[in-house]
A protein has these predicted regions:
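Noncatalytic, solvent-exposed loop/strand surfaces
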Residues: 22-432
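Bacterial N-terminal signal peptides
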Residues: 8-20
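N-terminal secretory signal peptides that target proteins for export/translocation
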Residues: 1-4
Length: 432
């Protein structure tokens, strides 16, 4: 199962600003770089302007053929794009220049193909600190490469820790702290969080993260989020029906919250990742089917287990299963699995407006991007919708068809938008 990026969940006080809440190391990068699955603020948003208002042939700058089916989201560092894909049965990291030409590719061992029809062995998105690129694959490979493609180090997590017991293929992406690359394994059986030295790959710490849940509830495809609380670098993790906040120095949790599925419904893995707006964590859970998914508003305050006090609101009529929400101007924007679009107030959970995209048999797996007054939302069949962002109403700006399946999430690359399809990487810029 895919995410994208997905996955991903990174203690914050009520007074903590959104800007200071996110602390991802970007040592050699620029503010316009897209260093991880959900971008600079880890919430699917960008302040870049001059972006295309539609993703049509008129705005298409180039498209590059990819070597194989991968569902990860690309990242960008300076003028280069990095993505993962299978190439002739090998897990591979690709580097692409700003014109759509391949600069280099690095094979990292045998691919383990995906199980879901929309999955792959390259579900997890790469991540960068501006100095190197870190990538993980279903095969168990976790690797760090320099920006020129030189392998810094490579590990086999399956050989070292065993295979993850999951119904679908892993979707959790690695995340970076100041010193470490963090991997979260949230699965049936032995689950854990581990930190590896960014320079050497040496294990810094590893902590168990095991919770008893109904069937499949212990399986997570989300991606952690790295945040800062009062100067303490921490990792917000969602999965196995619990939010936890380990610190990055030794993995010990300073805050936690359970109590999400009191009805003990089975077959509810965690797929969409939470988003953070000031001290509120908005957590999607449950499948978007007749059992109805739930959206939770959790206030991050205090220390220790805050299950009894953290739950502020709950919506049983509006949530998402696979696509992770995005954030703009302290508002939550959701593109749900069946094309429902909703703008919400994270403090109260109240709907500001709601509407629907054109009905289709195809679902949304990609997580939306909000930038330059637009929401970009690809559907799995390759149809991409652009929606004008408004505090008052829904307005569909454009509908375009890429002609191939789209699972990865769109990103901003300079003043362009990149969308990864099943066969190609597409680059769009504002029409002149």
């Amino acid at each position: 199962m895919v995410l994208k990026n997905v996955f991903t969940l990174a203690v914050v006080t009520a007074a903590l600003s959104l800007q200071s809440a996110f602390a991802q190391t970007e040592t050699a990068s620029t503010s316009s770089d897209w260093l991880n699955w959900r971008g600079p603020d880890q919430n699917g948003s960008s302040t870049q302007t001059g972006l295309p208002q539609a993703l049509s042939p008129k705005e298409l700058q180039w498209k590059m053929e990819l070597p194989g089916k991968g569902c990860s989201t690309p990242i960008s560092v300076a003028d280069s794009v990095y993505l993962t894909a299978p190439d002739q049965g090998k897990d591979t990291i690709l580097c692409i220049d700003g014109t759509g030409k391949k600069k280099w590719s690095r094979s990292l061992g045998k691919e383990s193909p995906g199980r879901h029809r929309n999955g792959s062995g390259s579900n997890a998105s790469p991540v960068s600190d501006g100095q190197g690129v870190f990538a993980s694959f279903k095969s168990g490979t976790l690797a760090a490469v320099e920006l020129d493609g030189t392998i810094r180090w490579q590990l086999d997590l399956v050989k070292e820790y065993g295979k993850a017991s999951m119904f679908w293929s892993e979707g959790t992406s690695p995340v970076l702290t100041e010193k470490h690359v963090i991997m979260a394994r949230i699965c049936a059986g032995e689950s854990w969080l581990a930190a590896f030295d960014k320079q050497t790959g040496k294990l810094a710490w590893k902590v168990d993260r095991n919770y008893k849940t109904p069937k499949e509830g212990d399986q997570g495809y989300t991606t952690p989020m790295v945040i800062d609380r009062d100067g303490v670098e921490s990792i917000l993790v969602w999965g196995a029906e619990h939010l936890t906040l380990p610190n990055t120095s030794d993995g010990q949790a300073s805050w936690a919250c359970g109590g999400f599925h009191l009805k003990k419904v089975g077959l509810w893995p965690a797929v969409a990742s939470p988003v953070l707006v000031e001290d509120m964590i908005v957590v999607p859970s449950g499948r978007n089917d007749k059992r109805k998914p739930i959206l939770h508003g959790i206030k991050m305050a205090g220390e220790g287990d805050q299950t009894e006090t953290a739950h502020q609101w709950k919506r049983e009529d509006a949530s998402t299963f696979v696509p992770t929400p995005c954030v703009r101007d302290k508002k939550i924007y959701m593109v749900r699995d069946k094309g429902e679009v909703e703008c919400l107030d994270p403090k109260t959970g109240e709907t500001i407006w709601a509407d629907k995209l054109p009905k289709s048999r195809s679902n949304f797996y990609s997580s939306p991007l909000v930038a330059d007054g637009m929401i970009y939302a690809p559907r799995e069949d390759g149809v991409v919708f652009t929606i004008k962002v408004s505090d008052e109403k829904f307005e569909l700006a454009a509908t375009n068809d890429l002609g191939e399946s789209t699972i990865g999430s769109p990103i901003v690359f300079g003043n362009q938008v990149l969308v990864r399809g099943q066969k190609h990487l597409f680059c769009f810029a504002a029409a002149k």
